[in-house]
Amino acid sequence: MEIIISNAAVNNGNRGCVALSLSSMYIIDKILNAKNIPHTFYLPQSGYDQKGEHMIRAGDVTLKFVSLMDITPLTVKHYIKNLIKYIAKWKEYQATKKVYKEADFILDIGQGDSFADIYGKRRFDWIFSQYRLGMKFKKTYCILPQTIGPFKEPTILKQACIGIDYAKCVMTRDRQSRDFVKRLLPNKAVSEIIDVAFFMPYKKKEFNSDSIHVGLNVSALLWYGGYTRNNQFGLKVDYPLLIHSVIDYFLAQANVKVHLIPHVVGGERHIENDYAVSYDLFEEYDHPNLVLSPLFLDPIAAKSYIAGMDFFMGARMHST
């Protein structure tokens, strides 16, 4: 069985997106192995520059997948810009097209919450490109559990409805998304399923029981006001002020340690890097009961660390 898992990143600093990709493969692999069905996973948006077979660990399971070339131009301008790359890597380009033509399923995880226009039209176009390929090659594709919407732009909403309606199976990870789809397409079957990251294996990290351990995820994207840096997501509060207030409150409590736990990590500063903002807060407070968590190398390490908390708060979905 040939399975394309689209909009699924594996080599990415957003540990939540990686958790979705890892968990999706982990669950499907487990089900198909139990039925003795041979299968191959293909990831066109894995994040790896080197195409071909890769392996990733999920607990005691080794998952194999093939990283593909991303062949979908978002616009004519984008196509022209990438034309030289397509010509230079013509064999790879044709090999990727062959995978799409022969695939049994396209399963789309949508990076969790990117099947929407809250991140802008370009992000939606990139996500929706896999829907277009599914329709172009007449493939059975399913929308894996994810957030769907919101959509502010009517033209984007119209495209989204076409894509959802064509899908063989539609799964959401929250009731709000399920109800949203039912309002858009009353006759479309849609299921509400828990987030696939709940199935990701982990090993609970043990902390000193003398303290109450409070985990806090600080979103860099919210800290800076979104990509536009002008309160893109319409928050009703001053987010940095709120974070300082939360930290101050818990540090004033007896026997409480506050752990700053990033969702997005990286070695360089950028607008989504939670670790950089957490590091700055850690340096600013210089408090013995404020802990900066490790820079997690994979989502399993992050989940294992979070599992050791007594109480947790987070802005990003997978942090919570």
Cite the ranges covered by each PLM segment.
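Active-site anion-handling motifs in enzyme catalytic cores
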Residues: 1-320
